[in-house]
């Protein structure tokens, strides 16, 4: 059984999603957004760090996964996003959590089946996969998608490692 905290970083809104995984079952524990205020970037980074630290204290996750920085047309936006990611990653590292990173394409592929999925498709699939009564808000759905992607990636690696070492009747299983 593992509790996974997924994070969709942003300098204004950072989404988070927490799931519990046991076997093939994924259970929704919580999600939401950390909304930063003001124009002072160092203060925003502290708000992200404090918010993620509080979520870690509340849910006690075993693993932490975050979306990788994409290439933005605006260099300033990409730098701010990278700094927001850094604040979240430091919070996870301070809590001694292993950190995994996934691209937006990997996340969308794991959740929807295509790396070109739209936000609405991700929201809908997260609602279906986690059996939620309503679709979560976009940033929270993206963060839950990060957690689901991490779970599926780990499941695939476990399955592959098991197959590579099990040999029966001259064939690998």
Swiss-Prot record:
Keywords on record: Cytoplasm, DNA damage, DNA recombination, DNA repair, DNA-binding, Endonuclease, Hydrolase, Magnesium, Metal-binding, Nuclease
E.C. code: 3.1.21.10
Residue positions of the active site: 8, 67, 139
Main location: cytoplasm
GO annotation (BP), single: DNA recombination
Obligatory cofactor(s): Mg(2+)
Manner of cofactor binding, per the entry note: Binds 2 Mg(2+) ion per subunit.
Similarity comment text for this entry: Belongs to the RuvC family.
HAMAP family, alphabetized: RuvC
Name of the protein described by the UniProt record: Crossover junction endodeoxyribonuclease RuvC
